[in-house]
């Protein structure tokens, strides 16, 4: 059974990701920054998702990651602990994704695209 046969959508998404090398400070702090540029080109016909005319959006996300690698060596064990802090900024107006069922879990919390959105980035600032 065919549904919505008159609905046409097309999108082309380009991502440019840059991660700097880790910088180690004298006090043991490790820091680096990430830059994510997303170019979304889209057009649609008879759809509420995309506009009828071609749209091009350029979005960016800046992330500054800081961590303090700690270790403790005993005669029997070697323990490590690495507290992390991630500062993020996405200064552009993004799509409203509150209705999507995206969840951040332990494995994705420090990823640059942690919500795994194709056509948008996480909006605002976060720590």
Regions of interest found by a model, annotated:
Residues 1-127:
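Outer-membrane beta-barrel translocator/pore domains, especially the C-terminal barrels
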């Amino acid at each position: 059974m065919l549904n919505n046969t008159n609905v046409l959508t097309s999108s082309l998404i380009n991502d440019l990701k840059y991660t700097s090398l880790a910088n180690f400070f004298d006090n043991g702090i490790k820091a680096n920054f990430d830059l994510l540029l997303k170019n979304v080109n889209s057009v649609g016909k008879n759809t509420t998702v995309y506009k009828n005319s071609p749209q091009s959006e350029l979005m960016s996300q800046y992330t500054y990651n800081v961590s303090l690698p700690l270790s403790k060596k005993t005669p029997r064990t070697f323990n490590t602990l690495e507290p992390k802090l991630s500062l993020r900024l996405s200064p552009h107006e993004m799509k409203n994704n509150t209705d999507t069922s995206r969840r951040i879990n332990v494995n994705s919390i420090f990823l640059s695209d942690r919500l795994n959105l194709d056509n948008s980035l996480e909006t605002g600032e976060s720590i």
